[in-house]
């Protein structure tokens, strides 16, 4: 067993928690014992009793991921095209049963983190406002994406949020340096991993999310990499994440928080994710499929850095453990509308929608 002290503390004395050794007849039994303690410690509610799930979310039968602008600046679907797609989808399924995930709505994927402003090339303020307003009039629920813990040091805002960077317990600055964004065969390191336990970063991100909710009236917000907990010297990341979510929930009680992937304690205050959908976690939360899942045709991952993988024409890429998810990249609507219709039909069948 290993105990790691809170990195933000410089205690001269450490009292290590006591360990209780037990015996279980199976892995599932051992996990069940762990989860009983976790449920008590972090107040994990069951899905059926959650108060942080708006009624509309319980009726969602389909999630569609509309891919926006790639890191390179290539645009898969601008705001006008996204609205055109949704208007067509409204002829295929009741829009109230659809959650629309707007990935990279805010400019170049990750490069423009953490500005979260509406880029002119995608259609500007007027185009984004029209997309949200008209889509919501149809009945769709709209959810833009935000990075929980990523900021580009080359953006002008960096000096005001730099104190929110993550430093690991050994003092190392933690950079997001594992992606080769420009395909030059070297990982790029202009992103720093940020810590919501630090006031400067949490206040910035909370302010940007709140502004988008107030300005455009979106129904939900998505926290990218929210499950990437790090024991940081600059603050308690878990408590900072919880504080951000609870602050926004207090201000906007009808707006849903969705995370990319969970760790066990996150289920206490985030009810929906798009990764980590093992059966045991359905007791607490619901899931849809990752934005990197291959789209119909070439199997593009859209804005995500993965690239390409095979699209399964038999399963249509749908997981039995997740809310059916429709990926829309640059050629999906023009070349593979029949596959879109087939995915929508399966989602309707699974939800018993006539």
PLM feature segments, named:
Residues 1-99, 134, 138-141:
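Carbohydrate-recognition beta-sandwich/jelly-roll modules
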Residues 127-133, 144, 148-211, 215, ...:
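Active-site-adjacent "subsite" loops/lids of carbohydrate-active enzymes
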